[in-house]
Structures are given as C-alpha cells and as structure tokens.
Amino acid sequence: MLGEKGGTPVCGIIGYTGENNAEEILLQGLRALEYRGYDSAGTTVFDKSGKPVTVKCRGRVENLAQKAAKKEISGTCGIGHTRWATHGAPEEKNAHPHASRSLTLVHNGIIDNCVELKKELENDGYEFVSDTDTECAAHLIDREYRRLSSPVKAIYSA
C-alpha cells in the first residue's frame, strides 16, 4: 500500500506448517496483514495428498474467507497473500498465490525485467493466466527446477 507521504507498494505474506487447519490460520494472519494490501487476496493449502488447493478473490480478506468456506479446505501447510496491485489490475486472476507446474508462489516486490522474461518463458512454452510479474517468477523457478533438479539451486538460478 502507498503510505500517506508516498512510499513503496507493499503486500502481506503469511505461511504456515503445523498440526492445525492451515486455512483458518492463514485467513487469521491475512486479516492482521490486510492494511498491507486489499486489492485482492488468496491462499494455497496443500491437502493430505499434497495437492494444492488455491482460493483467490478480488477485494478484501473477508471475501476470501467466504469463498474458502464453501470449499471446506483441509490441510496443515499453506501460504497466503494480500495484495496491493503493482503489476496487473486488482482482479482475481492477478491475486496470489501463482502456480507453475511444480510450485506455488507468493511474492512482494517488483521484477523490473518481467516483460522480457515473459516473452522468453512464452517461447519456452509457458502459458500465463495473469498480468503479474510474480507469475514470471513462478515459471522461471519451475524452468530452472526442471533443468537443475534442485529447488534451492533453481531459486538461486532464477
């Protein structure tokens, strides 16, 4: 969010892994972080089989909570994000988390060369569903993971 005297855009990010219901904890955390962005919000919780279940919405965290309640999400590990739009309009498709084949990602910041990266990744066969720079990061890390077979090396290489 932009501060009263300008400043830089910010977002709220939360992660959880433990024994309790991750969705409830993520939503509670996002409510506390909502001042950092209220254009859109989203969560991804990994169910008992490891499958990611993602819920996104435009607007405030309470909208997300209502949407998530309809899905009856159950899992003990997940990530959440509340967004102040920097790349892409405040629309559901631009809400985080973003996914690429092997990973799900939230991000706070601006990727200056995302236009060039997007063209490169599209040439490599990646399809984009959002207008965000974060989706570029997700696809780039995925591409490097496929090349290097190490998540840590892939992140550093990206």
Predicted regions and their residues:
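Conserved short alpha-helical segments that host acidic/polar catalytic motifs at enzyme active sites
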Residues: 2-158
